[in-house]
């Protein structure tokens, strides 16, 4: 299916103990199998450097344009060719470990559209083309709920990550 490139994308929790060592080990032992690394749960500044070292794409998971800008300015701008996508996990719709600023109320969900538009605007300011997708993750259950995001020039290329709903909650 993937031809001469890998067909596997792995997900690593950045704040997990030993994440960098584990990531190096996985990528060293799976050369040619892994094509991308999705990484969140923290600010994975070194993700781009590690991914580029092994010739795989990096897909950071972020919850705001501000977080992406910090990652881009500090590290990601050095290897933009390996940025595969930006995964946006909404602080209110996705699983609960996403960052909110002190000005945001966790009990008052906000519409994700303005936040994703702000992310795209930031990406454009940094010279990242609209063809590089933003992946909307968390709270995506039905495509019909997101139809106005598809082929929307304000947002550029958009993809959707579907997950499973929690079976047991309090």
Model-based region annotation:
Residues 1-129:
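Active-site entrance/lid segments in N-terminal catalytic domains of soluble metabolic enzymes
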Residues 21-32, 140-154:
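Short, electropositive alpha-helical surface patch
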Residues 42-43, 90-92, 97-99, 142-170:
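Glycine-rich phosphate-binding active-site loops on the catalytic face of alpha/beta enzymes
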Residues 131-142, 161:
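Glycine-rich anion-binding loop/nest that anchors nucleotide
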């Amino acid at each position: 299916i993937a031809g001469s490139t890998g067909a596997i994308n792995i997900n690593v929790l950045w704040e997990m103990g030993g994440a960098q060592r584990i990531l190096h080990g996985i990528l060293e032992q799976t050369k040619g199998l892994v094509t991308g690394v999705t990484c969140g749960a923290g600010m994975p500044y070194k993700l781009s450097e590690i991914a580029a070292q092994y010739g795989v794409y990096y897909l950071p998971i972020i919850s705001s344009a501000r977080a992406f800008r910090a990652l881009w300015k500090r590290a990601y701008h050095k290897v933009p060719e390996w940025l595969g996508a930006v995964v946006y996990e909404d602080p209110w719709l996705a699983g609960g470990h996403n960052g909110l600023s002190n000005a945001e109320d966790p009990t008052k969900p906000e519409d994700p559209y303005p936040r994703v538009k702000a992310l795209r605007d930031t990406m454009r300011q940094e010279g990242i083309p609209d063809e590089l997708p933003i992946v909307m993750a968390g709270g995506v259950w039905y495509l019909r709920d997101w139809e106005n995001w598809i082929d929307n020039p304000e947002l550029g290329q958009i993809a959707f990550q579907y997950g499973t709903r929690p079976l047991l909650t309090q």
